[in-house]
Amino acid sequence: RSNLIADRKAWIDDLLSEFDTDSMQIEKEVVWHNRPFEAIIEEVLKNNHELLIKGTQVSPSFQNLLFTPTDWHLLRKAPCAVLLVKEHEWPSHGQIIAAVHTGSEEEHHQKLNKRIIEHAQAMSKTLDASVHLVNAYPSAPVNIAVEIPEFDVTEYSDALEQHHINRMAALGREFGISTHAQHLSQGLPEQVIPEFAKQLDAELVVLGTIGRTGISAA
């Protein structure tokens, strides 16, 4: 075990040697653990980190994410923001997507929307990028027209769309995001978000999860 840990520390040293780190204070830690996500979360909690960055690989669509189980555990349970990165250029004046959920009136969803937008805007200042709001909303239940013959699916869909438009517009006004940077589409989030990411050629997607955090969430 000690030999493997020493080998990993040497690998980190070799990796850092490729970069100019003279002006940075870098602490290196190699931990032996059979559940990597727990070791990472313990480190975050111990040092009160505000951002966790991890490499990953992503296919052209969110439907075929190549995230590992560790990635998913960290997204759901890490007590800080998680940045999953892949090989991608970071151009000036790029696009950042803030994926929000405008269909819920619940306070915890509203707070999460605001945190997502705040993180996106903070990153936009660092990267000299523009922020776009993206939201996916569901279609009318398929069986409802059968169970309730007088139910007007078109009227329901139009009203639902307008509700999401109004809620997104309110977020746009609150955070100074113009109408042309507000995007809404009917469908599943895992379909809608990557479609807009491709359409906008986005460099970064900011999204959130509702759930417990920390080791107790495992």
Q: Where are each of the predicted segments found?
A:
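Active-site phosphate/pyrophosphate- and oxyanion-stabilizing loops and adjacent acidic/basic residues
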Residues: 72, 118-121, 169
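Hydrophobic/aromatic beta-strand patches that form the interior of the parallel beta-sheet core
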Residues: 53, 83, 97, 132-134, ...
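Short, solvent-exposed amphipathic alpha-helices that sit
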Residues: 4-15, 119, 159-167, 192
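Gly/Ser-rich helix-loop-strand patches that form or flank binding pockets
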Residues: 41-92, 195-218
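Small/aliphatic-rich secondary-structure junction motif
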Residues: 1-6, 95-151, 158, 174-177
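Structural beta-alpha unit
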Residues: 2, 17-52, 173-205, 212-215
